[in-house]
């Protein structure tokens, strides 16, 4: 084992009601994606949902956008996520043309800069 801290793996948002609940939270619009976040008020690991609307391309393009976002969260942004917080990332078509380094840096920067205040 290395001396690094244990990496926290975010859970997944899977139900429509969970995605809709996060819509009531903070929205951060950007060129590559829309980031919505909502503090749950517990100490459970963060949860992430990734979606791309049908306005964006065809199924192949939407799936590629989802895969790029999922990988950016896995390799870079997961460490920046606050416990007890739900995140929804709505991908945009511009992700297809953006360099992966720029995508993961932008995602990490937005998540790091907007950790919700802890309640209680």
From Swiss-Prot:
The keyword Glycosyltransferase does not apply. GO terms for molecular function: 3'-tRNA processing endoribonuclease activity; ribonuclease P activity; tRNA binding. Coiled coil: none annotated. Its EC number is 3.1.26.5. One of its GO terms (cellular component) is ribonuclease P complex. InterPro entries: Ribosomal_Su5_D2-typ_SF (IPR020568), Ribsml_uS5_D2-typ_fold_subgr (IPR014721), RNase_P (IPR000100), RNase_P_CS (IPR020539). SUPFAM superfamilies: Ribosomal protein S5 domain 2-like. One of its GO terms (biological process) is tRNA 5'-leader removal. Keywords: Endonuclease, Hydrolase, Nuclease, RNA-binding, tRNA processing. Consists of a catalytic RNA component (M1 or rnpB) and a protein subunit. Belongs to the RnpA family. HAMAP family: RNase_P. This is Ribonuclease P protein component.
């Amino acid at each position: 084992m290395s001396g690094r801290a244990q990496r926290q793996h975010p859970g997944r948002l899977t139900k429509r009601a969970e995605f809709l609940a996060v819509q009531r939270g903070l929205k951060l619009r950007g060129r590559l994606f829309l980031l919505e976040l909502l503090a749950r008020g517990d100490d459970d690991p963060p949860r992430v949902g990734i979606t791309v609307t049908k306005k964006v391309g065809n199924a192949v393009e939407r799936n590629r956008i989802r895969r790029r976002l999922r990988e950016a969260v896995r390799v870079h942004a997961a460490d920046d996520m606050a416990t007890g917080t739900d995140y929804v990332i709505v991908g945009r078509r511009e992700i297809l043309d953006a360099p992966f380094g720029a995508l993961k840096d932008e995602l990490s920067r937005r998540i790091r800069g907007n950790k919700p205040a802890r309640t209680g």
